Amino acid sequence: MVSLVKNDKKGFSVLGFVWFFVLLILLGNSLFSEGDTLYVGSNTVTLFGKYLCYALLAVSLDLIWGYLGILSLGHAAFFALGGYVMGMYLMRQIGTRGVYGNAELPDFMVFLNWHELPWYWYGVGHFPIALILIMLVPATLAFVFGFLAFKSRVGGVYLSIITQSLTFALALAFYRNETGFGGNNGLTDFKDILGFSITSNTTRDVLLICTAAALTIGYILCRIIVNSRLGRVVVAIRDSESRVRFIGYHVEYFKLFIFVFGAILAGIAGALYVPQVGIINPGEFNPINSIELVIWVAVGGRASLYGAIIGAILVNYSKTVFTGVFPDEWLYALGLLFVLVTLFLPKGVIGVIDIIKAKKADKGDGDKGTPVETKEAEHA
């Protein structure tokens, strides 16, 4: 198993940079006080944690789109489902500290004059159960959807449209107050997690470390998959599904496994996202979020995994910077960026880096060969 990841120098270099910045941020937040030049505020800790959640989400999509060849335009739905499960757990930890002081019901249910907790909220207040549901809920949806779609041999643009319809339908359902997930406002006003204040600097630091660890583990698992025999079959399905099917492989089972595994990673990313940003609402199901996710992967570079990390962090950092300067034009710029990358940089940022390295290597080989040719000419 070690042999499947030991040669991934580029990927581990990217992860090394991630951990380096995590360390710098944590040191700046803990060793220095507000007003110092090197002080890093809690907002920066939260912001970088959010970037890493997006990076894990992008890696999960790259596995599905880059290696399996399925362009899922509803992948953010799994992210949102994992986030909602974590939000439900955090809401159950509030107890009598809510506005209405009701230990049995969240505030929004009391406000809507509900008298009992819905059955699907049972047990979610226990962390081990919530942890299982964070993975199980997205996996179940992905399994049911994928089984029906892949068995029916739906593919290409039709599958992309169906995935987008799925996340749109979920958004409509979660916007309704009757579903018991907070309606438009979603779930918020969290107090603590595992008994620790969710707003304390220490908790934020630990959440950042947990997110970086989840990204690292998720990346390694994806790398093991794509470098294994399973991964080679998956890539073959992407390149020519009919040939793989003709050989005798049950293509739908391979597609289903990758689709479900990607959904689980997305759910974990969503669960780590919620306690750091302090809210989860139906807006996370917005199809635009899934389209933005595709752009992150495209900008970084498809079918590389580490390119998805670079793209997610790069695009979201740019979004943070430019939305303050050009708040109305940012979405247009993002769309233009996707078009330009698709037309001129099909391999994304990592493709540009590889081209630059190749040119430098060619130049170096040319320089080394010049003296030899000169000496041969002189002897001639």
Stretches found by the model and what they are:
Residues 1-380:
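Transmembrane alpha-helices and adjacent helix-loop boundaries
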